[in-house]
């Protein structure tokens, strides 16, 4: 009689343990699939906070993207025919179409397609435009967790901190010395041209 009970209990225990293992594995895979890349990077034990931001292949050299840079302050970055850098709220303005060219890994040069001027920043953090591309025209492009991009001068810093391309609430460029990565004035969406 005991053998008969064991043969019925043993398969039940096996089925239950298999069921629990399947549920456990399913829960883990569902939890991993629901994670953002930043959360998964945290679980992999990345120590640097810079590693938690996304990176794309186009940042590795030679790529050219044509985009409108839309600031979180509701202005498009614009370089006009005289080389003046400012914001515009006109989406269809031809001077707000930018060519974002990868110079090195994570480093880009931004050029107005219509004006043919490059965006540049001097050591005081003032944004201006140049016909010829040089080190002042190189910016570190960083994609933030909120899906916005920041552009910090690759050459210049202020008191050890980065200086960012930024447009204030009136569309006027903010000096790099007064900017921080967290400020919405420095957050841009590279919008595809439609």
Curated annotation (Swiss-Prot):
- InterPro entries linked to this entry: Fibroblast_GF_fam (IPR002209), IL1/FGF (IPR008996)
**PROSITE patterns per the UniProt record, alphabetical:** HBGF_FGF
Give a Gene Ontology cellular component term annotated to this protein. Answer: extracellular region
Main localisation: secreted
Keywords, comma-separated and alphabetical: Glycoprotein, Growth factor, Heparin-binding, Mitogen, Secreted, Signal
The record's Gene Ontology biological-process terms are: positive regulation of cell division
Question: Which CDD domains does this UniProt record tie to the protein?
Answer: beta-trefoil_FGF7 (cd23319)
Localization: Secreted
GO MF terms listed in the record are: growth factor activity; heparin binding
Q: Which of this chain's residues carry glycans?
A: 45
Q: Where is the signal peptide?
A: 1-31
Please name the Gene3D superfamilies in this protein's record.
2.80.10.50
The UniProt similarity line reads: Belongs to the heparin-binding growth factors family.
What this chain does, per the entry, is described as: Plays an important role in the regulation of embryonic development, cell proliferation and cell differentiation. Required for normal branching morphogenesis. Growth factor active on keratinocytes. Possible major paracrine effector of normal epithelial cell proliferation.
Under the subunit heading, UniProt states: Interacts with FGFBP1. Interacts with FGFR2. Affinity between fibroblast growth factors (FGFs) and their receptors is increased by heparan sulfate glycosaminoglycans that function as coreceptors.
Q: What is this protein called?
A: Fibroblast growth factor 7
